[in-house]
Amino acid sequence: MSPWQFTLFRIVFGSYLAVHFLHLAPWAGELFGKDGVLPDPTLNPTHGLFPNPLDLPLSDGMLTALVVFLAVVSLLLAAGRWRKPAAVVLWFGWTALFHRNNLIANPSLPYVGLLLVLTLLVPGGEPWSRGPRNADWAMPKWVFRTAWILMAAGYTFSGITKLPSESWTDGTAMKFLLDNPLARPGWMRDLMLSLPDGLLKLLTWGTLAAELLFLPLALWSRTRPWIWLTLVLMHLGIIAVVDFADLSLGMLMIHLFTFDPAWLRPRPSRPILIRFDGDCLMCSRTIRFVAEEDRAKLIRFRPLDVEGDRAPDSMLVESGDRTLDRSDGVLAILSTLGGHWRAMAMAGRLIPRPLRDGLYRFIAKRRYRWFGKGDACALPSEALKERLVP
């Protein structure tokens, strides 16, 4: 995992937690209060296993303030401000809420807690974080492997626990899910309900098989990305048809953390040339980032000749005999970086080009006003210096 990949994960994960807590805030008193659904904390099966200050008879206002406070801390985590203390506070709050009301349990809760612990153990100094950059930053291999081992074991264990359930073995679980009051109304649910019962049974058994086989398939490098993707698609499907997205969103966080950038190689595999506005501070920072992330060293840089080439609000990407500009150029750069950046490029191509180009032009016209001016070639980093061409 590269420094920028971890930064991307940190932003998404912190944002997810902030939204989670903000959605929880209006119901904090009802869920965790002395006059709520579980007024006596000793009724929880896990009571006494965790030193929980929420066992005190707190007012609804205090509980709401606590949950909002956790949302604010989540934003600090996303912004890279005091990441490690924020992770400790969030882990404690996350655990305390569960032990105050075990009825909120769902399979993603322990994985979110795991990610908070791992986020605490990852060294500091990643991009967009408080404090100096660590040029030698690296994700500890044991952290990445721990996440993979526990995720794979959890999925297979989940499949094993489903085997005694008649609805999973006879294939009717999917139909029960779609008929459940929590099913999300809409065309997707209606479409799935219109499918033959035999196909719904195959979907049920396929889901069960994917969970059971996750651990053994994760042990083999060739099948690992495919079983990872299968469960990602399963969770996206659950979000589409079940009106309880929090379970799957939490699991998607562990999938984001365990994504291996080596699965998506740079494309194209031949070098490309980026011609950029050297007076634009945003452009300067962007090419420094690209040079840092270009592990395959496929990208070269040259400042635009504004008078001879193109108006300064454009960036050109030369790939073979093609010259790309605007959003097509950005997507070509992301594809060349490979990994999660290539995945973002694949998603970006699903957006109609006029919309992509419109957003590009909107930012380009305001880049000097928003970001100022700066010379990318004045003090280039080592990664950039060797890529600049006259």
Each language-model region and where it sits:
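Thiol/selenol-based redox catalytic cores and closely related redox-interacting motifs
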Residues: 305-390
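Alpha-helical membrane-anchoring segments
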Residues: 1-276, 281-308
